[in-house]
């Protein structure tokens, strides 16, 4: 249950665990509804015990008149604790550390400036600065964030052209959370893109690999779980 929930979110609650437990036990038959609820409770209790509690403990004990029947404080929402896991927290730590490291390949200042401003891809000043920043940052993990319509796709297209010009054809790898999204990303960038889960499956079996100098673009990264993002960036 914890592993399944962690694929969908980095932080979860009692109710997330309850929903996943109900989903996984849906095909099991019980004599009564009470039996099903009792088993679900046991599964959720075990899942919470395997999780890391993020919600800080209460600093003081509430008076009895402010406690529920189970002894919890009425000043806190019932089952309002937030949870995560060691695997997710460690993956998050590695991602943050990589965002601080500036040992990754770059594009030379002259090439980045010419390619982002020479008209191959029409860019606004903001898009050009974003593209140049990523090309020259040297960070192992970098971000391009913006609202819909801000021109992220156009910036990524210019970034792909710049990077390929410096590091050669095939030096840009595109990943996306679904096959349809990967197809759309590939059409936008002009390179072959893969579903992230499929790419990792192929990577685990030695059917694909990353080499130094390659730029991995993960589109819609907020839709990917933390552990999945940790793997190709390592």
Predicted regions and their residues:
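Conserved ATP-binding/catalytic motifs of P-loop helicase motor domains
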Residues: 1-234
């Amino acid at each position: 249950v914890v592993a399944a929930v962690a694929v969908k979110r980095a932080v979860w609650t009692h109710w997330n665990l309850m929903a996943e437990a109900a989903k996984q036990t849906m095909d099991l038959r019980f004599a009564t509804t009470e039996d099903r609820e009792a088993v679900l409770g046991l599964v959720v209790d075990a899942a919470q015990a395997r999780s890391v509690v993020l919600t800080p403990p209460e600093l003081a004990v509430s008076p009895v008149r402010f406690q529920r029947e189970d002894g919890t404080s009425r000043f806190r929402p019932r089952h309002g604790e937030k949870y995560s896991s060691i695997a997710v927290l460690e993956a998050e730590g590695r991602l943050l550390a990589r965002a601080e490291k500036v040992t990754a390949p770059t594009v030379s200042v002259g090439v980045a400036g010419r390619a982002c401003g020479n008209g191959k891809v029409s860019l606004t000043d903001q898009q050009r600065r974003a593209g140049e920043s990523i090309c020259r940052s040297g960070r192992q993990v970098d971000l391009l964030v913006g609202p819909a319509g801000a021109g992220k796709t156009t910036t990524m297209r210019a970034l792909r052209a710049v990077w390929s010009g410096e590091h050669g054809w095939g030096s840009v790898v595109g990943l996306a959370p679904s096959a349809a999204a990967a197809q759309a990303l590939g059409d936008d960038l002009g390179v072959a893109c893969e579903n992230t889960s499929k790419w990792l499956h192929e990577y685990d079996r030695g059917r694909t690999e990353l080499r130094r100098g390659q730029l991995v673009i993960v589109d819609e990264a907020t839709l990917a779980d933390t552990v999945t993002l940790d793997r190709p960036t390592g």
